[in-house]
């Protein structure tokens, strides 16, 4: 996920090319994460890279998984 870029028609719009990195703490194993093939780690921060057009959905998913977003920073293309 690190260094993720948007492609297709979303990349043509000004918002489609914007990507943000969430710093999340407190993710825990629950019904939502039990459907995954791997366990959630129990300590420290997790970084999730999200395109602008999926920010709301990702915030909801993080909340359902028991996480708390402690920071959101834009990813600057270099």
Swiss-Prot record:
Record-level GO cellular component terms: phycobilisome; plasma membrane-derived thylakoid membrane
Membrane-protein topology: Peripheral membrane protein
Subcellular location: Cellular thylakoid membrane
Primary subcellular site in the record, as a coarse category: membrane
UniProt entry tagged with the keyword Lyase: no
A Pfam family matched in the record: CpcD
Signal peptide segment: none
Domain CpcD-like as annotated: residue spans: 17-75
GO biological process, one term: photosynthesis
Chain's role: Rod linker protein, associated with phycocyanin. Linker polypeptides determine the state of aggregation and the location of the disk-shaped phycobiliprotein units within the phycobilisome and modulate their spectroscopic properties in order to mediate a directed and optimal energy transfer.
Record-stated family: Belongs to the phycobilisome linker protein family.
Name assigned to this protein: Phycobilisome 8.9 kDa linker polypeptide, phycocyanin-associated, rod
Originating organism: Thermosynechococcus vestitus (strain NIES-2133 / IAM M-273 / BP-1)
Lineage of producing organism: Bacteria, Bacillati, Cyanobacteriota, Cyanophyceae, Acaryochloridales
